[in-house]
From Swiss-Prot:
It comes from Eremothecium gossypii (strain ATCC 10895 / CBS 109.51 / FGSC 9923 / NRRL Y-1056). One of its GO terms (biological process) is SNARE complex assembly. Residues 318-380, 470-532 form the t-SNARE coiled-coil homology domain. The keyword Nucleus does not apply. Residues 92-102 have a biased composition (Polar residues). Residues 11-24 have a biased composition (Basic and acidic residues). Residues 1-32, 68-184, 200-246, 259-284 are annotated as: Disordered. Disulfide bonds: none annotated. This is Protein transport protein SEC9. Residues 227-240 have a biased composition (Low complexity). Belongs to the SNAP-25 family. One of its GO terms (molecular function) is SNAP receptor activity.
Amino acid sequence: MGFKKFFGIRPPEEDTPERNRDLLTEEGIATKNPNSFRKEKFAAYGKFAAANAQDHVYAPAGYEQYARPGAGADKDELESLNRAATDAGDIGNTSRVGQPQQRDPYAVNDNYNPYANGTARDPYATAQPYARQAPVRQAGPRHAAGTPYGSAAVPQGGPGNPYGGSTAGAGTGRNPYQKNMNATVYPPAAGKTANPYASMAQDPYGKGEQRGIAGGPVAMPVPMQPRPQAAAETPRPQAAAEKRAPAVDVDDLNAVIEPTNEDDDLNNSIHEGNEGLNGQGQAPRRGFQTFEELQREQEMKQQMEEDEEVDEIKQQIRFTKQSSVASTRNTLKMAQDAELAGMNSLGMLGHQSEKLNNVERNLNLMKVQNRVAEDKVAELKRLNRNILAVHVGNPFTSKRKVREAEERIKNQRMQDKMQQEETTTQLMSSTNRIENALNDERHSVRERYQRDQALERAKKYQFENDEEDDEMEFEIDRNLDKIGQVSGRLKKLAIAAGQEIDSQQSRIKRIEEDADDMDIRIHLNTSRLTNIR
């Protein structure tokens, strides 16, 4: 039974973070309040940067999926990368027994290849070429299906085709001169004999026949197109009259002749046309021009050329103004886009400055608490020394040591306050710099009266100004003025961004140095605690 159980000695309970914070506050040590909330002015730009952040990966073309975490790490995908092309499972040209063969995705479907499509026309299109096949019926002679002697329908007993009623076959039991009823839709004219050669216009080797194995046509009768009426072979008198050329108009010799133009009447006297002139007829036309006429004609021609040149200049001016309007619009659009990008960049720099300020404040707090930890470690080491080592204070130097300790604490506190004020000043300077650059100060009063000034300046470039021309001049002047304003704001944004980047670089460097120093101090305190026995 140990002394701890005998005397009921138990280790103290471990303090919670809230209890430690209260103890540090009671001793006058600075702590961080978890309930305090600092308002951030550029938090929206932080959200914007997080939403537009992209994870850039570097991988060869086609392997981007393996660069992202969790993608391409499956076992099957890894095995597929290590699988050889000669493995049994990857050979695509061979198929197992009982499984259908896969279709080649790179095969070309040729409609003109008779062996590409398995149709009824190809006797070799079956999947099993050595299986038992049904015999193919073939016609005997070449003219079995398309003979001209079987296409003319003649009444029984008429003096028509003498071979129409023949039943003699050509080795197959089929009449090669059999009538084709589908080819004779209209009966022949009464009292006339049908032309036995009327159907010779049809090609017996057309697409109605199908070639068989032996080179002859396969016995597959295809209905032929109906031929026109036989009566159309002998045109009717009315049709012949209609086809006759139109008759030429012939003058009626019995009609009364009426003069078409009284002025050109040949029966009039030669003096009738000169009556009333009294010897004063029209002036004869001269074959030359006077100097005044030539000068007048030259002036008119010169005036027309000048008018054409003026019109051409007007068109060029109009085209140039329209091009200038479009150019100023595009320039203003690009300038506004550049300004928006600069404002977003500067806003994100402001959000970064606020985050750096939080890091600096936390580092300052860590410095203060680490100094307290150093004092506590030294006190713990003194209390944990040998019981025989008696420590007796020097009464002659005790007051001096107390004054030195108080002075040291006061100086340290002043140094901490100055460092805290410097951190706050840097944040305020960064915020004011960014706010001044982001503020868009537009003078509405100036924009209200600039129309009259723009039109007054544009008068020397106009010579026939209308409402549309005034609008173009005003838009050009307004766009140029806006481009100048945007350029000034862009310059201000660029200067502010450069100053902010320089300031943040120095702050980041100082944070890095403080973090390294803090790491060394914490490691040193940990080593001291480990050496205490």
